[in-house]
Amino acid sequence: MSMNPIHVVGGGLAGSEAAWQIAEAGVPVVLHEMRPVRRTDAHHTDRLAELVCSNSFRADDWTGNAVGLLHAEMRRLGSIIMSAGDAHQVPAGGALAVDREGFSQAVTERLEAHPLVTIAREEIAGLPPQDWDSVILATGPLTSPALADAVLKLTGEDQLSFFDAIAPIVHFESIDMDVAWRQSRYDKAGPGGDAAAYINCPMTEAQYEAFIDALLAAPKAEFKEWEHVPYFDGCLPIEVMAERGRETLRHGPMKPVGLTNAHRPDEKPHAVVQLRQDNALGTLWNMVGFQTKLKHGAQTEVFRMIPGLEKAVFARLGGLHRNTFINSPRLLDGVLRLKAQPRLRFAGQVTGVEGYVESAAVGLLAGRFAAAERLGRPAVAPPPTTALGGLIGHITGGHLEGGSGSFQPMNINYGLIPPIAPPKRDAEGRRLGAKEKTRIKKRLVGERALADLEAWLSGAQAVAAE
């Protein structure tokens, strides 16, 4: 029996994941990606699922971190993004970071090889054709003006935009390891068991103050078209953080806690700049939290003030790209359909989630929902006790009150998942401290989430077997 394909517009993380989930459900899918026909300022290749900002999927521990729990849930649901990430991971302490080239190449090759996936290299300008009865719009942070305007006219909603900034990448051989040293914060080992996954560059108080002075005085790139657009707090440029207070960076990405200078163990650094491995070869390292909109000449001058980076050679300098998202709680139903035109679904960053994993997670759900409908089955969201359920709950039901602009992009966090009261005493009857209670509570939330996800998945499989 022939079946009309589902169309997915956008070949980023969300679109790639959505297409994979649809095809794995046995439904044909056409994945439309405008590159290379039309390029963007943020992308550098024509591959699917290209990572344009950091190479980190963040913490991977499902027992102690909400994004780690999201990782675990996505793995259970056969995520192509998590599978490719696991296959191409690079050392990153307690985080899951990936070789960006190998990762996107793997996603591209697997989708190209799938018999139910057709990849169309073309731009879909404006709303998709009316005869496409099931469409997922996963157009990402650089949604084309034509499509954005069409959605605005359809819904009557105001468009919301903000900046995302990109951090520089440094060639390893140009880092002075007689000054810098390798260590993960608190010597915490990551998925690969490496407790020395970061390169650390120390600063004295005088060096830090001089760095802040230079940072504040450096010329910044002008983006007049977007000059009144707000930043997303999770991706603030370092110069914007510095403008909020001279100590802000020292308590943010440059905090020295949990680190000991291997060359001078008796001297406590006033601040530390960390670099994280960016590719499998270990030849490229990105400056953690150093997203910036400084002009390129100023970046090389200011960042070479950092001890250990005096002769740094940059493979990529920092920059900015725009992010556009819709007012999802008003516009979308509980299974990500546009209320004004239910044949259209949205997925990824355009829905108001922030982060690679979150974008892929919403793509995963959109793909499963669309495939279920095509197969005549009910599209049912995961339980709110799961990370996936908490995330979709935020974008389809969160922040309706508070007026214009109250709905803002959100990373996955425990605040989106119903809490569990931890025990007050341990097995020996000793009263638990606050830190121990928090640790136990996070683990209990994770255990409940995975059990509830399993029950939800079993229910979906039972319906499919009928």
Curated annotation (Swiss-Prot):
Its cofactor is FAD. This is Methylenetetrahydrofolate--tRNA-(uracil-5-)-methyltransferase TrmFO. Its EC number is 2.1.1.74. It catalyses: uridine(54) in tRNA + (6R)-5,10-methylene-5,6,7,8-tetrahydrofolate + NADH + H(+) = 5-methyluridine(54) in tRNA + (6S)-5,6,7,8-tetrahydrofolate + NAD(+); uridine(54) in tRNA + (6R)-5,10-methylene-5,6,7,8-tetrahydrofolate + NADPH + H(+) = 5-methyluridine(54) in tRNA + (6S)-5,6,7,8-tetrahydrofolate + NADP(+). Its main location: cytoplasm. Keywords: Cytoplasm, FAD, Flavoprotein, Methyltransferase, NAD, NADP, Transferase, tRNA processing. Belongs to the MnmG family. TrmFO subfamily.
